[in-house]
């Protein structure tokens, strides 16, 4: 089962479950947690397929900065029964420090025992866009690259 908090992640979860189903012939369910419980329509904090006892859950995130959404999401998952959160897939790892000097993603891995992976890191994004032209302008020029480097000198993980 895949789960993602907030509505932005629904397309990510749908795409992931469809690809897993196509590649491996697995029937994967997904759900999303809402910002707040609804008292009408499809009630509850979770939208989609219910989490059931024995489920292994992979959390899908669009971006991880400090790990706050994981701290909010894990209790919701665990409250559903005898479930096993096993992993976190992040579209973009911003590579920022968590509480200490390690990245937020590394802290999540160590704190919650989840396997974590990112599809792409900010370093890869910056490297790819540095001095690249798009519609007649350079996406990340020397000035912007210097500002990004200064930001990561201050807030980046070791």
PLM-predicted stretches and their roles:
Residues 14-57, 68-72:
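Short, glycine/charge-rich flexible loops or terminal/linker lids adjacent to PRPP-binding catalytic cores
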Residues 11, 38-42, 66-68, 96-98, ...:
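Short, well-ordered, mixed-charge alpha-helical segments that flank or form enzyme active sites
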Residues 46-95:
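A contiguous pocket-lining binding segment that forms or flanks enzyme active sites
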Residues 75-158:
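PRPP-dependent phosphoribosyltransferase catalytic core
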Residues 6-12:
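Gly/Ser/Thr-rich loops at beta-strand to alpha-helix junctions
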Residues 34, 41-45, 62-63, 151-155:
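Non-catalytic interaction surface on structured domains
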Residues 6, 33-36, 92:
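Fold-independent oxyanion-binding glycine-rich loops
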Residues 1-3:
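Short, small-residue-biased leader/transition segments that mark boundaries at the very start
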